[in-house]
Amino acid sequence: MHPSGAPGEARRRRSYTPEGLFVITGPGESYGKGSAWMLGGEHGYVQAVLLRDSLAIHPDTLYIENIEVKPDRRGRGHGRILYLKAERFAENIGAKWIQIDSEAEAVGFWSEMGFTETGKLFYAGKTSMVKKIG
């Protein structure tokens, strides 16, 4: 509830991206490389950071740290929808690439989304993948 006491006021004042994701945390209107966001949707959330070029495989990369679908909504395509909204968000903030580190069981999903393996290892047991966007 909003401090004014109006039940719907907090939801109405929530900051939304043009893609329909609400901003749980973020840098505000002034952002740059190193800025991080937590974006929520009806079925889950996305954690992402605009990487500094020294940490990215390619310049202008949005790194998706995590996409989480609510447990009771899994297996119905909500992860795909959430990712596609995150991809549009990346394009809108000027990213040219998206980079992820995938769990082994999710590599097929990310390949279907257009990602390719980089052959680099950043985290043990995970597969580094990238996708050119825009």
Regions from the language model: what does each represent?
Residues S111-L121:
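Conserved acetyl-CoA-binding loop of GNAT-fold acetyltransferases
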Residues A10-P59, E65:
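Acetyl-CoA-dependent GNAT
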Residues Q99-G108, F122-K126:
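Conserved beta-strand-loop-alpha-helix junction that forms the acyl-donor binding cleft
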Residues M1-G26, R73, S111, G134:
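Charge-dense, intrinsically disordered terminal/linker segments
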Residues V69, G75-R88:
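Conserved acetyl-CoA-binding loop-helix of GNAT-fold acetyltransferases
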Residues K33-G34, A124-S128:
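Short hydrophobic/aromatic beta-strand or adjacent loop that forms the aromatic wall/cage
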Residues A90-S102:
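Conserved GNAT acetyl-CoA-binding A-motif
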Residues E65, G108-E112:
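Acidic/histidine-enriched, beta-strand-rich ligand/metal-binding domains
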